[in-house]
Amino acid sequence: MDLLTLEGWLDNTAFAVLFLTMLLYWCGAAFPQWPLLTAAGRTGMAIANLCITGLLAARWIEGGYFPISNLYESLFFLCWGLTAMHFVAESISGQPLVGVVTAPVAMGITAFAALSLPPEMQQSAPLVPALKSNWLMMHVSVMMLSYATLMVGSLLAIALLVVTWGQPVNLKGSSVGTGSFRSRRPEPSLEASTGNGGTTVLTPPALQLSLQRLTLAETLDNLSYRMIGLGFPLLTIGIISGAVWANEAWGAPWSWDPKETWALIVWLVYAAYLHARMTRDWQGRKPAILATVGFGVVWVCYLGVNLLGKGLHSYGWFF
């Protein structure tokens, strides 16, 4: 089997495995009494990560350079980072809901790369002169890992918003998300006769968050903060290394290129998130909304800017 055939087999296998993994995690969340579903989903995520690792290794051997120079390669590297950070988040929390939100995004990325990109975009090509640098691996890989980590943190924040949707719940505690307790606004109650001259107070179930969901909300809030706290330094290192590389390649560390501008916007959004958590003691829904905004901004920075087809970072242009 030649490398091209192996690559085609691995990218399609990664997509199929991630699709099944997504279904397993969703079924595991719907039927928590069947823990084997979640265990199978975890195994599927590991298999997908190994398939992508093999794909990237084959591309590296074929091209002779770190495989992150075009859109196809960067999408699979992003998916590799996403599946790797999935295991980091799941090992920290032991919460299977992590896979419920990460598996569909990873599956969507592989589907776009393997099934939507034209064949010429999937082929390995010689590096353009500007990319023939040792900074390629340092800058681009760190940036992609930061995107993957921030995406996982933001996806967990989105899950928190879904879990607490329509509920006036506040999480209060330390800035690092530990030692928190729950508080809810007063909820309307109803009085009903007991039949023996007394009354009992009833609280409408629809207006309550169960203890299990409150605990889940706390876990998601804490885990989202930890993952974003991990991704933000990676993003900072990636931006700084890019500035150093740009200064060597083009004579200026910053040129307000569209990709550079949006990377700065991403940095500012997550800096605001961390600032609010550390100095304003934000927890729960408010920082989750900010992280959700960050999720969209990351995608604009990574993929949306490529739609312009302009600037020094337009190597991923595909129209």
Curated annotation (Swiss-Prot):
Keyword Transmembrane helix: yes
Taxonomic path: Bacteria, Bacillati, Cyanobacteriota, Cyanophyceae, Acaryochloridales
A single GO cellular-component term on record: plasma membrane-derived thylakoid membrane
Alphabetically ordered keywords of this record: Cytochrome c-type biogenesis, Membrane, Thylakoid, Transmembrane, Transmembrane helix
Region (Disordered): 175-201
Biased composition annotated in UniProt, kind: Polar residues: 191-201
Localization, UniProt: Cellular thylakoid membrane
Transmembrane segments: 14-34, 46-66, 74-94, 97-117, 142-162, 227-247, 254-274, 288-308
Superkingdom of origin: Bacteria
A Pfam family of this chain: Cytochrom_C_asm
Gene name of the record: ccsA
Species annotation: Thermosynechococcus vestitus (strain NIES-2133 / IAM M-273 / BP-1)
Name of the protein in its database record: Cytochrome c biogenesis protein CcsA
